[in-house]
């Protein structure tokens, strides 16, 4: 028997999500149901599903997450569980603020990667700007991958989920657009849980507003218009490539632009969120 559930649709720099409000944890979404919801032809279409649930109702204790906090139960489009999604956190925080589910503009959200502090800089029911404390952008080493028989070397970066950020020497934004981005072949010993791969332009010297461009292939999804944790990984790798340990970088993705701050102890991601639709769906 099919079940009818309420949903909303939102995106952050065109990384789009289905939002399911389930504070008491009563909606049991299977991997197959998530896949069907995210199907862009036979379903609603999205890069993933954000289930809005109280951490204490999740049934699984996450270290550092208070049971009373709102928890972002995030699923990739293929139905797999994901530890973290930076763009998803922005949309999640926007949803909470727009529906008066929090009483302050600064609050903490639980994720499978741990607690994430957010600041809602502005919000109405349609649009918001949110800053997320993403935690340390931890470098895990150097690795390589193959994309369409072309080798790319990059920096492994852990943001609660794994990334391989490949800064490509001499790559221009125009040339980046023309790369035939497809599923990467990567070192499974280095990335046993799979990996998100970013192709990144170099950070130019002498800019008042340092910027990079990137494209991303997301684990469990494919190429997306944006990836929040991926922009942080890309900024970390681009700064390191330019001989810098810290800095603020504007990251341009196909879906727009975000601001990433890399600090000694943590990183931040600031960017827009938009809620575009609400409704009900039978699955």
Curated annotation (Swiss-Prot):
<dbReference type="GO" id="GO:0008837">
    <property type="term" value="F:diaminopimelate epimerase activity"/>
</dbReference>
<keyword id="KW-0963">Cytoplasm</keyword>
<dbReference type="InterPro" id="IPR001653">
    <property type="entry name" value="DAP_epimerase_DapF"/>
</dbReference>
<feature type="binding site">
    <location>
        <position position="15"/>
    </location>
    <ligand>
        <name>substrate</name>
    </ligand>
</feature>
<feature type="active site" description="Proton acceptor">
    <location>
        <position position="227"/>
    </location>
</feature>
<keyword id="KW-0413">Isomerase</keyword>
<feature type="binding site">
    <location>
        <begin position="228"/>
        <end position="229"/>
    </location>
    <ligand>
        <name>substrate</name>
    </ligand>
</feature>
<feature type="binding site">
    <location>
        <position position="76"/>
    </location>
    <ligand>
        <name>substrate</name>
    </ligand>
</feature>
<feature type="binding site">
    <location>
        <begin position="218"/>
        <end position="219"/>
    </location>
    <ligand>
        <name>substrate</name>
    </ligand>
</feature>
<dbReference type="GO" id="GO:0009089">
    <property type="term" value="P:lysine biosynthetic process via diaminopimelate"/>
</dbReference>
<comment type="similarity">
    <text>Belongs to the diaminopimelate epimerase family.</text>
</comment>
<dbReference type="InterPro" id="IPR018510">
    <property type="entry name" value="DAP_epimerase_AS"/>
</dbReference>
<dbReference type="GO" id="GO:0005829">
    <property type="term" value="C:cytosol"/>
</dbReference>
<feature type="binding site">
    <location>
        <position position="161"/>
    </location>
    <ligand>
        <name>substrate</name>
    </ligand>
</feature>
<dbReference type="Pfam" id="PF01678">
    <property type="entry name" value="DAP_epimerase"/>
</dbReference>
<feature type="active site" description="Proton donor">
    <location>
        <position position="85"/>
    </location>
</feature>
<comment type="pathway">
    <text>Amino-acid biosynthesis; L-lysine biosynthesis via DAP pathway; DL-2,6-diaminopimelate from LL-2,6-diaminopimelate: step 1/1.</text>
</comment>
<comment type="subunit">
    <text>Homodimer.</text>
</comment>
<feature type="site" description="Could be important to modulate the pK values of the two catalytic cysteine residues">
    <location>
        <position position="218"/>
    </location>
</feature>
<feature type="binding site">
    <location>
        <begin position="86"/>
        <end position="87"/>
    </location>
    <ligand>
        <name>substrate</name>
    </ligand>
</feature>
<protein>
    <recommendedName>
        <fullName>Diaminopimelate epimerase</fullName>
        <ecNumber>5.1.1.7</ecNumber>
    </recommendedName>
</protein>
<comment type="function">
    <text>Catalyzes the stereoinversion of LL-2,6-diaminopimelate (L,L-DAP) to meso-diaminopimelate (meso-DAP), a precursor of L-lysine and an essential component of the bacterial peptidoglycan.</text>
</comment>
<keyword id="KW-0457">Lysine biosynthesis</keyword>
<keyword id="KW-0028">Amino-acid biosynthesis</keyword>
<feature type="binding site">
    <location>
        <position position="196"/>
    </location>
    <ligand>
        <name>substrate</name>
    </ligand>
</feature>
<feature type="site" description="Could be important to modulate the pK values of the two catalytic cysteine residues">
    <location>
        <position position="163"/>
    </location>
</feature>
């Amino acid at each position: 028997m099919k079940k009818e559930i309420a949903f909303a649709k939102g995106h952050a720099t065109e990384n789009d999500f289905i939002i399911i409000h389930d504070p008491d944890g009563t909606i049991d979404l299977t991997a197959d149901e998530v896949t069907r919801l995210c199907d862009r032809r036979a379903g609603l279409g999205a890069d993933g599903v954000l289930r809005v649930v109280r951490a204490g109702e999740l049934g699984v204790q996450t270290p550092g997450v208070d049971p009373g906090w709102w928890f972002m139960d995030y699923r990739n489009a293929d139905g797999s569980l994901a530890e973290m999604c930076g763009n998803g956190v922005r949309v999640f925080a926007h949803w909470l603020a727009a529906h008066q589910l929090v009483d302050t503009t600064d609050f903490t959200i639980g994720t499978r990667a741990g607690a994430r502090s957010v600041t809602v800089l502005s919000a109405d029911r349609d649009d918001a700007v949110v800053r997320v404390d993403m935690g340390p952008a931890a470098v895990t080493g150097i690795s390589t991958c193959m994309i369409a028989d072309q080798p790319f070397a990059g920096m492994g970066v852990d943001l609660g989920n794994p990334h391989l950020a490949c800064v490509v020497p001499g790559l221009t934004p125009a040339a980046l657009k023309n790369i035939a981005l497809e599923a990467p072949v990567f070192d499974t010993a280095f990335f046993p849980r799979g990996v998100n791969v970013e192709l990144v332009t170099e950070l130019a010297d002498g800019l008042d507003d340092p910027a990079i461009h990137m494209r991303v292939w997301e684990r469990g999804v494919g190429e997306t218009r944006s990836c929040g944790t991926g922009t942080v990984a890309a900024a970390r790798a681009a700064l390191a490539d330019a001989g810098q340990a810290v800095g603020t970088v504007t990251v341009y993705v196909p879906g727009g632009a975000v601001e990433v701050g890399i600090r000694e102890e943590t990183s931040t991601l600031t960017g827009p969120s938009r809620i575009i639709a609400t409704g009900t769906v039978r699955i």
